[in-house]
């Protein structure tokens, strides 16, 4: 007889219902064609998951290194259940590609951990424009799915503050 882990522990299943979630998107404008395609695919997927257009806020920034500043400011507002970073870094002839790729990824992760807010990283790092073109549709949709799933997970794992307040009032 084979037992699954759900026979022994409580399992929080992936929840891709975006209804009532408030999602912020930060899109870089550098390599704009790729970024606009990423954003379009992402928003279309968010809508298909039940996030309403009025619950999606999009801001644009000059490039990938500026994404983290906007994410930080959006996280500080407390208005969002999840954030999405979208951009495209294409390798050139200098070390700049590695710097931008590494720093943008590290800062996005740091903001997510420090703020406790899920952030889907959709900053493409590709060698060529062709590679970026091949990835924009899938990556944009994957970021939407990831942020909805992680926002729902965060909400499910967050204690209900009202219950705690009511319980302490009854004492």
UniProtKB/Swiss-Prot annotation:
Active site: 96
Residue numbers binding (2S)-2-hydroxy-3-oxobutyl phosphate: 93-94, 135
UniProt xrefs under InterPro entries: LS, LS/RS, LS/RS_sf
CDD domains: Lumazine_synthase-I
Residues binding 5-amino-6-(D-ribitylamino)uracil: 30, 64-66, 88-90, 121
Catalysed conversion reaction: (2S)-2-hydroxy-3-oxobutyl phosphate + 5-amino-6-(D-ribitylamino)uracil = 6,7-dimethyl-8-(1-D-ribityl)lumazine + phosphate + 2 H2O + H(+)
UniProtKB keywords: Riboflavin biosynthesis, Transferase
Keyword Transferase set for record: yes
Annotated metabolic or biological route of this protein: Cofactor biosynthesis; riboflavin biosynthesis; riboflavin from 2-hydroxy-3-oxobutyl phosphate and 5-amino-6-(D-ribitylamino)uracil: step 1/2
Entry's EC annotation: 2.5.1.78
GO CC term (a single one): cytosol
GO BP term (any one): riboflavin biosynthetic process
Gene Ontology MF annotations: 6,7-dimethyl-8-ribityllumazine synthase activity
Similarity remark: Belongs to the DMRL synthase family.
Function of the molecule: Catalyzes the formation of 6,7-dimethyl-8-ribityllumazine by condensation of 5-amino-6-(D-ribitylamino)uracil with 3,4-dihydroxy-2-butanone 4-phosphate. This is the penultimate step in the biosynthesis of riboflavin.
Protein's recorded name: 6,7-dimethyl-8-ribityllumazine synthase
Gene this chain is encoded by: ribH
């Amino acid at each position: 007889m084979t037992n699954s882990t759900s026979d022994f522990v409580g399992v929080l299943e992936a929840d891709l219902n975006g209804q009532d979630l408030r999602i912020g998107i930060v899109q870089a404008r550098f390599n704009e064609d790729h970024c606009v395609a990423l954003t379009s695919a992402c928003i279309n997927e968010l809508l298909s998951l039940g996030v309403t257009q009025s619950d999606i806020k999009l801001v644009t920034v000059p490039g990938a290194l500026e994404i983290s500043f906007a994410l930080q400011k959006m996280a500080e507002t407390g208005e969002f259940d999840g954030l999405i970073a979208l951009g495209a870094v294409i390798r050139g002839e200098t070390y700049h590609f590695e710097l931008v790729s590494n720093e943008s990824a590290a800062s996005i992760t740091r903001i997510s951990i420090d703020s406790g807010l899920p952030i889907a990283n959709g900053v493409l790092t590709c060698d060529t424009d062709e590679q970026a073109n091949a990835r924009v549709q899938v990556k944009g949709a994957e970021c939407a799915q990831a942020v909805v799933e992680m926002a729902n997970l965060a909400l499910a794992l967050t204690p209900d503050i009202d219950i705690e307040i009511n319980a302490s009032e009854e004492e």
